[in-house]
């Protein structure tokens, strides 16, 4: 079990993570919709993850969402790197009712984000612009190359949840053990 903590003047975060788990989640960030997305991610990535966060949500949820992305990325970095004997690449298209989102990832040890989800406004009290902030923090702290591409959909909740689940399935596929892969790069290092 990997454990990473981070404490700033804005947030206090602890993440415990087992990369090859059973999809068990214990999430408490103080942001209900975000907790729901992280639970979906954990379940479909087949990782076990505990996240606790105390943040300055009396201001807004920005610091909590972004900083949790940082710490989850750092925990996954500890669990995955150096990359050896895994697939490295993963992709998935996930649908949720009318919504469809495609995710492509490369455990390249290079942070990069392509975020093409046409969402704005709120889901309940949650500012959906924070979704991109989470994925950026996640991608650059893991680090990995992450593309999230909108295919269709109208319901913001469904689009966002499809994105989190697509990332989960892509990650599960990328970290699948392949003893023949060695270091999956022509460079000999990632």
From Swiss-Prot:
PROSITE patterns: IGP_DEHYDRATASE_1 (PS00954), IGP_DEHYDRATASE_2 (PS00955). Coiled coil: none annotated. This is Imidazoleglycerol-phosphate dehydratase. PANTHER family: IMIDAZOLEGLYCEROL-PHOSPHATE DEHYDRATASE, IMIDAZOLEGLYCEROL-PHOSPHATE DEHYDRATASE HIS7. It is found in: Cytoplasm. It holds the Pfam family IGPD. Pathway: Amino-acid biosynthesis; L-histidine biosynthesis; L-histidine from 5-phospho-alpha-D-ribose 1-diphosphate: step 6/9. One of its GO terms (biological process) is L-histidine biosynthetic process. Belongs to the imidazoleglycerol-phosphate dehydratase family. InterPro entries: IGPD_sf (IPR038494), ImidazoleglycerolP_deHydtase (IPR000807), ImidazoleglycerP_deHydtase_CS (IPR020565), Ribosomal_Su5_D2-typ_SF (IPR020568). SUPFAM superfamilies: Ribosomal protein S5 domain 2-like. NCBIfam families: PRK00951.2-1, PRK00951.2-4. The gene is hisB. It comes from Sulfurovum sp. (strain NBC37-1). Its EC number is 4.2.1.19. Keywords: Amino-acid biosynthesis, Cytoplasm, Histidine biosynthesis, Lyase.
């Amino acid at each position: 079990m990997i454990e990473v903590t981070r404490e700033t003047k804005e947030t206090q975060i602890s993440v415990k993570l087992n990369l090859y788990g059973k999809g068990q989640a214990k999430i408490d960030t103080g942001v209900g919709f975000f907790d729901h997305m992280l639970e979906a991610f954990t379940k479909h990535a087949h990782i076990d993850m505990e996240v606790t966060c105390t943040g300055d949500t009396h201001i807004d949820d920005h610091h909590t969402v972004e900083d949790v992305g940082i710490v989850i990325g750092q925990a996954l970095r500890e669990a995955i790197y150096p990359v050896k004997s895994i697939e490295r690449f993963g992709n998935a298209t996930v649908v949720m009712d009318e919504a469809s989102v495609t995710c492509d990832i490369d455990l390249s040890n290079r942070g990069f984000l392509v975020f093409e989800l046409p969402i704005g406004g709120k889901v309940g009290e949650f500012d959906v612009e924070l979704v991109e902030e989470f994925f950026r923090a996640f991608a650059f702290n893991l680090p990995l190359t992450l593309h999230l591409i909108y295919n269709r959909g109208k319901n913001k909740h469904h689009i966002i949840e499809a994105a989190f689940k697509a990332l989960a399935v892509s990650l599960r596929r990328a970290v699948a053990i392949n003893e023949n892969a060695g270091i999956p790069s022509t460079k000999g290092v990632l």
